From Swiss-Prot:
This is NF-kappa-B inhibitor-like protein 1. It comes from Sus scrofa. Residues 1-34, 131-167, 185-293 are annotated as: Disordered. Residues 150-159 have a biased composition (Acidic residues). SUPFAM superfamilies: Ankyrin repeat (SSF48403). GO terms for biological process: cellular response to lipopolysaccharide; negative regulation of canonical NF-kappaB signal transduction; negative regulation of lipopolysaccharide-mediated signaling pathway; negative regulation of NF-kappaB transcription factor activity; negative regulation of toll-like receptor signaling pathway; negative regulation of tumor necrosis factor production. ANK repeats lie at residues 64-93, 97-133. Disulfide bonds: none annotated. Involved in the regulation of innate immune response. Acts as negative regulator of Toll-like receptor and interferon-regulatory factor (IRF) signaling pathways. Contributes to the negative regulation of transcriptional activation of NF-kappa-B target genes in response to endogenous pro-inflammatory stimuli.
């Protein structure tokens, strides 16, 4: 006698069939709404696009190929870019070629730097280290030289190279110091100095090294060309300018901290809201912030007030060692390349520069860095 097959209740059977259908229908509706959202952006109907996302907050604003941020950069559509960033679009999102929105903005040239590249960089600085399938970072597309060091192992490698170079320089300076101090062992007026910082010690070593070289040239009676005769003066002038650069940077940082502390103390006592501002220029009037944030002329350029990047690079080279000393000149140029590299400069001084001057300052720093790279290549 055969057992009857178990009967599934009619309600459960209908539920099991409807679940995948309802899930597929929900996915299809979401995809249609996302396509409609992208059409609104392409047509410039930003209010409709924002209203659609408010009614359906689960939509993916990065969906599509190319993604909406990439399309806004390619079309030079700054209002759409600002809306997407406000709605939570991810600048690090990659398309099928591995490009981020920063890659797309970098390919639009200098005209898109202020309106597209800087807002994306401010929202997601880590995207500068993302490479596409061709192995390029946004900084390489802009011609900034070495890629942005975003991975921890690359940062450690760069730090180890920097430490190795400093140790080698310290060893050479110690050898020179031993030679110099041997000449003054019998000097009764020589006093033991207190321990000093590494920066002060290295500056003193460089000055004494230059004096020793000058004394050797005088005793040997060697005739130098005009460039070599003025090299010691240029070297001392360059050291003085480096010292002034450090002092101005420290003074600006101290002024910024004091200004922030003063504003924090005055904020509770002044509850009156600020009046509405007319535009981006109104946020930073030309007379305001002079004592706390840098404008273009406040940056310690190699030439007073900035100027032509080639002229600034030539001025830096002229202040270095003479052309006959190839090794010393290459080391000097390496220090200047590190100091004026756009990535390093942006990381170190971004908070000290007026926002509305940042594009102009970074454009000049980029041009100066490229000019220094050309001088360094010419020495190889």
């Amino acid at each position: 006698m055969s057992n009857p097959s178990p009967q599934v209740p009619e309600g459960e059977a209908s539920t099991s069939v409807c679940r995948p259908k309802s899930s597929m229908a929900s996915t299809s509706r979401r995809q249609r709404r996302e396509r409609r959202f992208r059409r609104y952006l392409s047509a410039g109907r930003l209010v409709r696009a924002q209203a659609l996302l408010q009614r359906h907050p689960g939509l993916d604003v990065d969906a599509g190929q190319p993604p909406p941020l990439h399309r806004a950069c390619a079309r030079h559509d700054a209002p759409a870019l600002c809306l997407l960033l406000r709605l939570g679009a991810d600048p690090a999102h990659q398309d099928r070629h591995g490009d981020t929105a920063l890659h797309a903005a970098a390919r639009q040239g200098p005209d898109a730097y202020t309106d597209f590249f800087l807002p994306l960089l401010s929202r997601c600085p880590s995207a500068m280290g993302i490479k596409n399938k061709d192995g390029e970072t946004p900084g390489q597309i802009l011609g900034w030289g070495p890629p942005w060091d975003s991975a921890e192992e690359e940062e450690e490698d760069e730090a180890s190279k920097e430490r190795e170079w400093r140790q080698k320089l310290q060893g050479e300076l110690e050898d020179e110091w031993q030679e110099v101090i041997g000449r003054f062992e019998d000097d009764a007026s020589h006093e033991t100095q207190e321990p000093e910082s590494f920066s002060a010690w290295s500056d003193r070593m460089a000055r004494e090294h230059a004096q020793k070289r000058q004394q050797q040239r005088e005793t040997e009676g060697a005739c130098r060309p005009p460039r070599a005769e003025g090299s010691s003066h240029s070297w001392r002038q360059q050291e003085e300018e480096q010292r002034l650069f450090r002092e101005r940077a420290r003074a600006k940082e101290e002024e910024l901290r004091e200004s922030q502390a003063r504003r924090a103390q005055e904020a509770p006592r002044d509850p009156v809201p600020e009046p509405a501002r007319a535009g981006p220029r109104a946020e930073h009037p030309r007379g305001a912030g002079r004592g706390s944030l840098w404008r273009f002329g406040d940056v310690p350029w190699p030439c007073p007030g900035g100027g032509d990047p080639e002229a600034m690079a030539a001025a830096l080279v002229a202040r270095g060692p003479p052309l006959e000393e190839q090794g010393a000149l290459r080391r000097y140029l390496r220090v200047q390349q590190v100091r004026w590299h756009p990535d390093r400069f942006l990381q170190r001084f971004r908070s000290q520069i007026e926002t509305w001057e940042l594009g102009r300052v970074m454009g000049a720093v980029t041009a100066l860095s490229q000019a220094l790279n050309r001088h360094a290549e010419a020495l190889k």
